[in-house]
């Protein structure tokens, strides 16, 4: 076995072990709530508020293992923040992994992992999750491949090549549709919630271990940082339009959490990721959207700005 194959297999085992540990912790928490409910029924007393249970799949916005750009290693992402919100915080089985593109999130192994999770009743209080949370699309565009979607600045081009970018969005859209189809088979009626990221600054800032993701392509295609910021803005607006089109089809049972324009420049740790306080702002938007849409009970308190 060559070194690349060894590294890949080792990385895969680490991810599988991490997901298994997350699942073990999640199931132990669900079992405690189930036991409390059973005890309340036996004693014929009112049970305390029952938390929502949710399945999360996604990228680094749902699985960010850094504090900004530095140590300590600590999950500060949207799911970590959301799991601490409200008088009865939701219990979220998080299958997300940083760095995953939408095509990876909906690849055969990841779909099989979601199917296993959805079928395991030990993960849910009512046989299936109350919601599925999905973060996908950013890694399909950002990175060394970002230059594919840019015109070279020869003094006449406008920046984002809409034709090439829309073709990439078509692949991302197909991944969302694949998720809806999987949900319809395994957990019919469960709503899917996603988000549209926010407008980053392509300034080359990144953690020590990875990145940058945007400025190298901006430089390669002869654009300035202010011009690059406008290009990234246009790309994310187009991404949101695609998501809103999916949301407009009631059959998709899909809800877009409006996250664009929320973060201030100081909220960004690097080109793609907020500081913990920025992730908390995004999580608060999820909490509000979930509270509005899941009307059978409202375990969330109003988020604090």
Residue spans of the language-model regions?
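Histidine-centered active-site loop/cap adjacent to the catalytic His
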Residues: 267-305
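Hydrophobic, aromatic-enriched interface-forming segments
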Residues: 168-214
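A structural motif corresponding to the C-terminal end of an alpha-helix
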Residues: 85-87, 171-191, 234-257
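A solvent-exposed, charged loop/short amphipathic helix patch at secondary-structure junctions
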Residues: 143-169, 207-230
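Short amphipathic alpha-helices and their capping/turn segments at secondary-structure boundaries
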Residues: 37-48, 108-132, 177-189, 245
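N-terminal secretory targeting modules
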Residues: 1-57, 61-80, 84-87, 298-305
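Conserved SGNH/GDSL esterase-like catalytic core that processes O-acyl groups on lipids
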Residues: 61-162
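Substrate-gating cap/lid alpha-helix
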Residues: 202-255
């Amino acid at each position: 076995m060559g070194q690349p194959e060894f590294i890949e297999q080792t990385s895969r085992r680490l991810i599988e072990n991490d997901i298994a540990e997350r699942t073990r912790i999640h199931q132990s928490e669900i079992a405690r709530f189930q036991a409390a409910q059973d005890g309340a029924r036996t004693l014929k007393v009112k049970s305390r508020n029952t938390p929502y249970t949710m399945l999360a799949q996604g990228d680094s916005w749902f699985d960010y293992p850094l504090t900004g750009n530095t140590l300590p290693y600590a999950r500060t992402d949207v799911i970590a923040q959301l799991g601490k919100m409200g008088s009865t915080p939701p219990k979220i089985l998080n299958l997300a992994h940083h760095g995953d593109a939408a095509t990876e999130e909906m690849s055969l192994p990841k779909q099989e992992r979601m199917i296993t999770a959805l079928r395991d009743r030990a993960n849910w209080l009512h046989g299936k999750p109350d919601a599925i949370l999905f973060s996908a699309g950013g890694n399909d565009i950002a990175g060394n491949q970002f230059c594919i979607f840019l015109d070279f600045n020869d003094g006449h081009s406008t920046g984002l090549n809409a034709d090439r970018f829309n073709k990439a969005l078509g692949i991302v859209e197909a991944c969302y549709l694949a998720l809806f189809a999987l949900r319809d088979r395994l957990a019919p009626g469960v709503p899917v919630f996603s988000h549209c990221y926010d407008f980053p600054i392509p300034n080359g800032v990144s953690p020590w271990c990875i990145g940058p993701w945007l400025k190298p392509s901006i430089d390669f295609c002869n654009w300035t940082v202010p011009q690059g910021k406008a290009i990234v803005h246009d790309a994310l607006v187009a991404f949101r339009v695609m998501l809103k089109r999916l949301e407009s089809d009631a059959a998709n049972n899909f809800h877009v959490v409006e996250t664009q324009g929320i973060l201030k420049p100081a909220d960004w740790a690097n080109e793609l990721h907020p500081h913990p306080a920025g992730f908390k702002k995004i999580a608060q938007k999820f909490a509000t959207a979930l509270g509005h849409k899941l009307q059978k009970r409202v375990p969330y308190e109003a988020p604090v700005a």
